[in-house]
Amino acid sequence: MGRYRLTKDADADLLTMFLYGFETFGVARADAFRMDMVRCFELLADNPRLGRSADEFAPGARRHEHARHVIFYDEQPDGVLITSIIHERSMPRLRER
């Protein structure tokens, strides 16, 4: 079984999304969102090639679309390192950088 780790930026992304969900939809939906993301991270850790190449953002990076979010990560010998989590609405702005 692979393992996943989050960078500080990815951890901050997840916290921001959780807090938005908490304030907008309540604790139950926010917690369900967080658990769903954790399951996705575990899936990626076990199957690092599930995502597709994201070399256009960073050499060696991979991306995986999950629900309305894009998870960027790097393959590691023992799993994956989640580098950022971005809502799909933010993707056009990210491409402009």
Regions found by a protein language model. Give the residues of each.
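Enriched for short, Lys/Arg-rich terminal
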Residues: 70, 74-97
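Arg/Lys-rich, positively charged N-terminal/basic patches that mediate binding to nucleic acids
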Residues: 1-32
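Basic/aromatic recognition patch in beta-strand/loop cores that engages polyanionic ligands
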Residues: 49-78
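Short proline/glycine- and basic residue-enriched helix-capping loop/turn segments at helix->loop/beta transitions
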Residues: 43-46
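Short alpha-helical segments used as structural interaction elements across diverse proteins
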Residues: 2, 26, 31, 59-60, ...
